[in-house]
């Protein structure tokens, strides 16, 4: 989720209408686009969550966006402040530096 949000997912609107409301036009990463993951299951019981469950969905995506932005800054010296971060946006920022 975080990788797609940072690099490819972009909702497009024209006069309030969504122009890319399907998975053909709205680009999300496929499994082949993402790195291999090593998953570790940790058994625990949280009395606050329903049936002892803990949140495990949205929380882990938060560090992905700034990590990618900082990696780009370290590599080419430009700060990206708009998502998704695309090659053409990076190229434009690099040209603005010169």
What are these regions (language model features)?
Residues 1-98:
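Cofactor-binding beta-sheet edge motifs in enzyme active sites
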């Amino acid at each position: 989720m975080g990788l797609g949000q940072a690099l490819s997912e972009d909702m497009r609107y024209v006069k309030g209408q969504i122009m890319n409301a399907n998975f053909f036009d709205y680009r999300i990463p496929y499994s082949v686009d993402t790195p291999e993951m090593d998953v570790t299951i940790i058994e625990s019981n949280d009395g606050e969550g329903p049936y002892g469950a803990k949140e495990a969905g949205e929380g882990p995506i938060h560090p992905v966006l700034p990590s990618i932005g900082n990696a780009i800054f370290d590599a080419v010296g430009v700060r990206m402040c708009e998502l998704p971060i695309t090659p053409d946006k990076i190229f434009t920022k690099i040209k603005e530096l010169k």
